[in-house]
Regions:
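Structured, contiguous alpha/beta core segments that scaffold functional sites
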Residues: 1-188
Length: 188
């Protein structure tokens, strides 16, 4: 019990600094055994307020389609077919504000925002419909081509069927948040 015992004395049981409530909220653990997901997080006033402020702030910003003139300057392209979709009404069910607010909410909660691009027989874009980010996966096929896999549910219009739908990149508007692989955003 001499000199070395003072250096190598036993210590109390180490404490885990990750047991705090802030850590559990941010990283998912909880003493109650309930997991925190996007929907349950939105039931917290602080999360709801932050998401609402950010999504509404983005949705209220003016959005226009521009074209270059012969002189090299830009002007609003009000007659462009995409102008109405982006500025006024992306689909018959929602305004541009609601569409952009929805996509921003998905981006904040899931790290990605997706919309299906609907085209007519000529290939012209006629509508944009938001898709639930938690039911979308992005992958590559055997040849390295990107594809999107969306899990349909009974409530999805217009098919009202369950199942998986494969979408080409040209049929999906994908807005990723910051991520690690360049394909999908990291879910916060």
């Amino acid at each position: 019990m001499g000199f070395l015992s003072g250096i190598f004395h036993s210590r109390d049981k180490p404490t885990n600094s990750t047991n705090g409530s802030a850590y559990r909220f941010l990283f998912g653990g909880s003493n109650s055994g309930k997991s925190v997901n996007e929907r349950s997080a939105m039931q917290m006033t602080a999360v709801y307020a932050c998401v609402r402020i950010l999504s509404e702030s983005i949705a209220v910003l003016p959005v226009h389609v521009y074209k270059y003139t012969d002189s090299g300057s830009k002007e609003k392209a009000i007659k462009h077919p995409l102008y109405r979709l982006i500025h006024d009404e992306p689909n018959p069910e929602m305004t541009s504000f609601v569409f952009r607010e929805t996509l921003m909410t998905h981006l904040l909660l899931y790290g990605n925002a997706y919309a299906q691009i609907i085209r007519n027989g000529k290939g012209e874009v006629i509508a944009l419909y938001p898709l639930m980010a938690n039911r979308m996966s992005v992958d590559r096929d055997d040849k390295g081509h990107l594809y999107y896999q969306y899990q349909m549910q009974d409530s999805d219009a217009p098919t009202m069927k369950n199942g998986t739908v494969i979408l080409k990149p040209s049929d999906v508007l994908h807005i990723p948040g910051p991520g690690f692989d360049g394909l999908v955003g990291y879910s916060p």
